[in-house]
Amino acid sequence: MVLPTVAIVGRPNVGKSTLFNRIAGERISIVEDVEGVTRDRIYATGEWLNRQFSLIDTGGIDDVDAPFMEQIKHQAQIAMEEADVIVFVVSGKEGVTDADEYVSKILYRTNTPVILAVNKVDNPEMRNDIYDFYSLGLGDPYPVSSVHGIGTGDVLDAIVENLPVEEAEENDDIIRFSLIGRPNVGKSSLINAILGEDRVIASPVAGTTRDAIDTHFTDADGQEFTMIDTAGMRKSGKIYENTEKYSVMRAMRAIDRSDVVLMVINAEEGIREYDKRIAGFAHEAGKGMIIVVNKWDTIDKDNHTVAKWEADIRDQFQFLTYAPIIFVSALTKQRLNKLPDLIKRISESQNKRIPSAVLNDVIMDAIAINPTPTDKGKRLKIFYATQVSVKPPTFVVFVNEEELMHFSYLRFLENQIRAAFTFEGTPIHLIARKRK
């Protein structure tokens, strides 16, 4: 299901990150009382009144070297392009500022619902000061103390009230995939090359996210695919499309909608921190993964080149041991014909179910090879295991004491399950649970 997007905007030091964390329900942003602190995590999932939504802290997208007004203009433009609902955060302690008026004039022109949250209203006496914010022309101001959690419920009520109508579940028979990677790694060329293959029939269809265009095609075997647009075929204001932090946000949204993620690396430039960050997000989200090294035609090669590259990739992406690596060229179409079948195999792995009896035979064989650990004279006992879900395949292992299940033994069991059932290209999750 595609989640609607809520963007938080506002000038530095008004408490955007604190409100973000309060709504997301966990401390996932770096919060310091210093103006302009950048944050690593700018994207999370929020839930209120049984409605889920994607939450974006646009303050984390700022170019900190840019002039102040350019930063907040950037935030507002991103919010207007990307969001279904905008939460504009101001400070009740400082009152209306020139920067607040500047942002409000930009937001006033949008058709996107704007919720005005007056933060740092930390005591009842301060509520009388919020009326000045009516001058911004954005409707009723909501008094909030995000540090203490006061008033956030009212803001969440307003968010849910303004979310678009829930969309119907998407067809599970269609495999959805996206190509993600840093700007200029050749994603567009790869997309064009994939769609240019004679074996596929491509047609642009209206996407389910705001202003997006996805591409639907069918292969020679009749399998339907949807390629999710991460390039952002959006309205004309694409000033910041090639900035790296902006592309992080786009990539995260695409990952949310994908069954399989193709992590594209530019062979000419190698692996960067951006690649590891985005790949980590896809891994945490439980998505199928393929590592695609593009522009392979530009590399001088000998008999050891592929092995060296594979070793380096495995070293840099140690959490992606399950992900296949493929070396391609969008220009020469080298190995591109292998991608649709590889995507299909990984989708099958994502949806694979293992009968409990067969699974437990593998678990018992694993214990015979490597007995369960002990701690302070007490041995871990595994009673049985069962698969509880797919996408990604998730297994619960019932034990006598959860604390005795060390992560290294869980990893051993995961490796044994992989060896038995070949979960190609997908993470699998093992959860230890005490038997009642």
From Swiss-Prot:
UniProt: GTP 2 binding residues: 181-188, 229-233, 294-297
Keyword Repeat: yes
Gene3D superfamilies xref list: 3.30.300.20, P-loop containing nucleotide triphosphate hydrolases
PROSITE patterns (UniProt xref): G_ENGA
Example of a GO biological process term: ribosome biogenesis
Cited CDD domains: EngA1, EngA2
GO molecular function, one term: GTP binding
Domain of life, per lineage: Bacteria
Positions of GTP 1 binding: 10-17, 57-61, 119-122
Domain KH-like: from-to ranges: 352-436
Residue ranges of every copy of the EngA-type G domain listed in the record: 4-167, 175-351
Keywords for this protein: GTP-binding, Nucleotide-binding, Repeat, Ribosome biogenesis
InterPro entries in the cross-refs: G_ENGA (IPR031166), GTP-bd (IPR006073), GTPase_Der (IPR016484), KH_dom-like (IPR032859), KH_dom-like_a/b (IPR015946), P-loop_NTPase (IPR027417), Small_GTP-bd (IPR005225)
Assembly, per entry: Associates with the 50S ribosomal subunit.
Family under the similarity heading: Belongs to the TRAFAC class TrmE-Era-EngA-EngB-Septin-like GTPase superfamily. EngA (Der) GTPase family.
Function: GTPase that plays an essential role in the late steps of ribosome biogenesis.
Protein name: GTPase Der
Organism: Streptococcus pyogenes serotype M1
Chain's gene name: der
